[in-house]
């Protein structure tokens, strides 16, 4: 028996992971430029640095932060925070942030448990506090991976990085032993089993770096087997019905199931994290069905709770009355969707996944914070007529805020009255942009193929080439691409052309203009081994698109898009922002300006003549998502309504809106990118036409 076990271990240790379709570069190899750099500099000047010291969300009191006197605090908030903070320190020049990073890592490595478990020992009985569980260590492992792989001018020293890799190996071996002993079972804590993909990613990260220990393979198998028996995400995305039977819809006030499976399977953040579960497991299984499950998950999300900004209508949990544009999405769901989409795209090179990543990044992500990144929302919605309570920008707000649209139904409201907002979103929001920077470029074919996936401005350093993308995409219809390389070997340049483009063309400096077909990875023709440089401009042709069939509540409402941008009517509001005093995040509340007309209905938006794109302007220097100065607008025809009961209750009416509610003349209204709004109507009602009103 012992010999058989030993042979099994040897066989496991010699196993290999299935290679990803695209190879991700280490953090620090791709540096933000242009507006993306400006946004990350706002993070460094705002709450991403400040929360290491400020009293906000329990972050600075966490055992994962630098203060040696703090050993408790809000554990999930602290590890969430580090998961975004650490990669940011590799992308933005801030000596103060790097000092905080090093102090935190030193503290973490000095406080391991008796078996080497990060964060200290996990009690081996079944009655333990949430602050001491497997999930409490899964996220910090992702942050430590960023530290260990960080390259470039802001990287730690190699000795410290090696120590972190060693600590991660020991930590995961300790976790494997304890889970195998079921002291406690992996499924005892629901957050861990709902998000086991984080362990898969951590083990695979170590194996990819030569640490092919049998315990890592065993750990992946253990968590997959135990978690999948409780919550089989891939099967659920393939055919699950979240609303049948209705009694299964459990959220915060209704966690009656002892295993919390019903709660976990409806919780929005879990769902967004689980998008990558199948593709991540594919590296172990080699099963094409696993690889394709990310697309299956997105189709499932869009079937049940689609939202216009690429996320879903799920404030905390899937709502019992789904697909309401006034149902918000939790900030954690936004950033976890971005990370899942990036990870899945790297594994299968499906351009639809990167399109979805950009859609979330350019529309939903900016709505999670104020424009100076000094406060965050717990959730936002695509139709939002007040910014207060959990939807406001600030940490530890009291959740006495009900749904934004107070008139739709009482059954779907949920609240945790008089409870300060926990640190999840205040901690987690910081991973959004740094990990998006890392998504812009990959390699394939052992580095011989450079894959430019994103066109937000960046500069990347490869072993034999430097690649940069310039411009202000997505707030422009073009991007410049520059490659400086060491000649001598054959190479390819592969460009992702998004599916939302009507057409695209590549204008090569000193060469021809070639068509680049949308919705594909396009290999640039005519490259030679002796090329030392390459310069080109990628041009996109976009049209205004009116989506008419996406909403049944409100019936007949439309969305208006152009390229990767979703356009909203900016509801006039009165803003109240606290002063930033260096010890706490800002809070921003916005209420409707009752003296300004906002209850509009569009006039025949499907008529091309009724919608006019006004072109792009330069972004505000240093403030990419300046709410006072949107960089683009679409002028639409509309009427101002009066006496519409739905509007009086805070949500848009069904369409068509009867003409008796709008006796005035047709007026021009400006629609702007959702990313540049505080209050907004994105899902818009439509007036009845003359025939309907007859």
Predicted segments with their positions:
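Beta-strand-rich binding/interaction modules
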Residues: 488-509
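C-terminal beta-rich recognition modules with glycine/proline-rich loops and embedded aromatic residues
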Residues: 294, 355-363, 368, 374-479, ...
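Extended ligand-binding groove/face enriched in aromatic
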Residues: 67-71, 89-255
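Solvent-exposed beta-strand/loop surfaces of large extracellular or lumenal domains
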Residues: 503-525, 544-553
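Well-ordered alpha-helical scaffold segments within catalytic/enzyme domains
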Residues: 36, 82-95, 139-158, 198-212, ...
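Catalytic-core region of carbohydrate-active enzymes that cleave or remodel glycosidic bonds
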Residues: 280-304, 324-373, 385
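Low-complexity, Ser/Thr/Pro/Gly-enriched N-terminal "stalk/linker" regions
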Residues: 16-77, 95-121
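Solvent-exposed loop and edge beta-strand segments that line ligand/cofactor-binding
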Residues: 62-78, 119-137, 179-196, 232-280, ...
